[in-house]
């Protein structure tokens, strides 16, 4: 797999999980002889929701909730076959979404 690049994008609601997963991926890739660029923190996406506190009156009284989606991006330059096999066998936590582009 010469002159190729693997781009890995991680998404999670908990920043501790995403940092731990990124560290595992970087460690695995470096151990198998690949060059890793990143992890680069991408902007956190914040979704806010306004909910009425009362079912009947008091329209001005509201609760605000938010969901924060943290993202990390990393590139693996010139991956070897061992790198790809090791990344496929890697077990990441359930709360982390992984997108891989070759």
UniProtKB/Swiss-Prot annotation:
Biological processes annotated in GO: translation
Instruction: Write out the GO cellular component annotations.
Output: ribonucleoprotein complex; ribosome
Q: Which GO terms describe its molecular function?
A: structural constituent of ribosome; tRNA binding
Would the keyword Transferase be found if you checked this record's keyword annotation? no
SMART domains noted in UniProt:
Ribosomal_S10
Q: Which UniProt keywords apply?
A: Ribonucleoprotein, Ribosomal protein
Pfam family of the protein (one): Ribosomal_S10
Q: Which SUPFAM superfamilies match?
A: Ribosomal protein S10
This protein's source sits in the domain of life called Bacteria
Claim: Ribonucleoprotein is one of the keywords in the record: yes
What family classification does the UniProt entry report for this protein?
A: Belongs to the universal ribosomal protein uS10 family.
Subunit relationships: Part of the 30S ribosomal subunit.
Q: Note the HAMAP family from the entry.
A: Ribosomal_uS10
What biological function has been recorded for the protein in this entry? Involved in the binding of tRNA to the ribosomes.
What NCBIfam families does the database record attribute to this sequence?
A: PRK00596.1, rpsJ_bact
Q: What is this protein called?
A: Small ribosomal subunit protein uS10
What species does this protein belong to?
A: Cupriavidus necator (strain ATCC 17699 / DSM 428 / KCTC 22496 / NCIMB 10442 / H16 / Stanier 337)
């Amino acid at each position: 797999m010469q002159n190729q690049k693997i781009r890995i994008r991680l998404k999670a609601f908990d920043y501790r999980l995403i940092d731990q997963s990124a560290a595992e991926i970087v460690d695995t890739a470096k151990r198998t002889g690949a060059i890793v660029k990143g992890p680069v923190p991408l902007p956190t996406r914040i979704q806010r929701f306004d909910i009425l506190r009362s079912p009947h009156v008091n329209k001005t009284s509201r609760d605000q909730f938010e969901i924060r989606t943290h993202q990390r991006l990393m590139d693996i330059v010139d991956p070897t076959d061992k790198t790809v096999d090791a990344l496929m066998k890697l077990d990441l936590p359930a709360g982390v979404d992984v997108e891989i582009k070759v």
